[in-house]
A protein has these predicted regions:
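N-terminal [4Fe-4S]-dependent radical SAM core
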Residues: 4-52, 100-101
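Conserved non-cysteine loop/helix-boundary elements of the Radical SAM core domain that shape
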Residues: 69-270, 275
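Canonical Radical SAM [4Fe-4S] cluster-binding loop centered on the CxxxCxxC motif
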Residues: 48-83
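Short, charge-rich amphipathic segments
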Residues: 8-27, 52-60, 120-126, 195-209
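Alpha-helix C-terminal capping/termination sites
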Residues: 5, 275-276
Length: 279
C-alpha cells in the first residue's frame, strides 16, 4: 500500500516501523515480499483468473483451525454428495468463465485436506476441471496433500495423471508432542513415508509447510523441524506464524502456546537458514 501510494522503499520501511512498530528486519521482508508480488502481478492481464476448489474435510480438525472444515469421522456421509455437487458447480463455473471470455492461469485445490478424498473421488474432481475449463494458459495446478496420513501412492498417481504440477505436504512440525497437542493423528515417521512417495512420483514442484508458535513447541523444536524439512530438498518451504483465530481449539480450550519472544526466535532462525539453503 505504501509503495502504491507513491512512497519510496525507504519511506515505506520507515512507515511500517513508525506506525505499526514493525521491526526493521520484518519491514525489510515485507518490502521484499511486496516487490515480488508486484512483479508477478505485472504478468497478469485483466481477463486472467485463478480457480480455487475447496475440500472441507480432514482426518481430524487441528487445534489452530478455524476454516470451514469437518473431520471425516464426523461427516463421512457428507463426502459423496459434496463431491457430486462440487463437480456440478465446476461444470457451471466453467461455462460462466467461457461466456465471460476469461482465462484460467492457475488451479488450486485446497481445504481442508483434498487428499482426504478417495483416489476415485479426486479423479472425478480433476476430470471435471479438465472438461469444464480451457487449460491452455494454465501455468500451475496445485493440490494440497496437507496431511501425510492421507497420502497414498494411488492418489499421487491420480494427481500426476491429471497433470498436477505442484503438491504441498504440510507437516507443520516434526515434534511428536506438538503433533499430539494440535490434534494430528500421524507421526513424524508418516511424514517420511509421504515424502518418499511424493519423490517417487516426480512432481515438478513440492512445497512443505511449517508453523512457528504451535502449542507445546519450543525454539529448539522448531529448529529441528526446519532442519528436517531441509533434508527432503523441497522446492519451497513455507513458514507460517501461528494465527489465533476465533473458533479454534487453541482459544476455546486455552492451550499453552509459546510467547512472542520464542516465536521471534523461531522466525529469526528460519529466515537466514532458508536463505543460506538457497530459498
Amino acid at each position: 500500500w505504501a509503495l502504491e501510494d507513491g512512497k519510496s522503499p525507504e519511506e515505506a520501511r520507515a512507515y511500517l516501523e513508525e506506525h505499526y512498530f514493525v521491526t526493521p528486519s520484518r519491514a525489510a521482508l515485507a518490502l521484499e515480499t511486496g516487490a515480488t508480488a508486484a512483479k508477478a502481478a505485472r504478468r497478469l492481464e485483466k481477463r486472467d483468473i485463478d480457480v480455487y476448489v475447496g475440500i472441507p474435510f480432514c482426518p481430524t480438525r487441528c487445534a489452530y483451525c478455524s476454516f470451514v472444515s469437518q473431520s471425516v469421522e464426523r461427516s463421512f456421509a457428507l463426502v459423496p454428495p459434496y463431491v457430486d455437487a462440487l463437480c456440478g458447480e465446476i461444470s457451471a463455473g466453467g461455462e460462466m468463465v467461457r461466456r465471460a471470455g476469461l482465462r484460467v492461469r492457475t488451479f488450486y485445490m485446497g481445504g481442508g485436506t483434498p487428499t482426504t478424498l478417495t483416489a476415485e473421488q479426486m479423479d472425478r474432481v480433476l476430470t471435471a476441471f479438465e472438461t469444464s475449463f480451457d487449460r491452455t494458459a494454465c501455468e500451475e495446478i496445485t493440490v494440497e496433500a496437507g496431511r501425510p496420513d492421507t497420502i497414498t501412492a494411488e492418489k499421487l498417481v491420480v494427481l500426476r495423471t491429471h497433470g498436477v504440477t505442484r503438491v504441498s505436504v504440510n507437516p507443520q512440525t516434526f515434534e511428536e508432542n506438538v503433533l499430539r497437542a494440535i490434534g494430528r493423528c500421524h507421526t513424524a515417521a508418516d511424514i517420511d513415508r509421504a515424502m518418499e512417495l511424493v519423490a517417487r512420483c516426480g512432481f515438478p514442484h513440492v512445497n512443505m509447510d511449517l508453523i512457528a508458535g504451535l502449542p507445546e513447541d519450543t525454539a529448539e523444536g522448531f529448529r529441528r523441524s526446519l532442519d528436517r524439512c531441509l533434508t527432503y530438498g523441497p522446492d519451497d518451504i513455507t513458514v507460517h506464524t501461528l494465527a489465533l483465530k476465533k473458533g479454534s481449539r487453541i482459544l476455546t480450550e486455552g492451550l499453552r502456546i509459546p510467547g512472542a519472544e520464542t516465536v521471534a526466535e523461531m522466525l529469526d532462525y528460519a529466515s537466514p537458514t532458508l536463505r543460506t539453503a538457497g530459498y
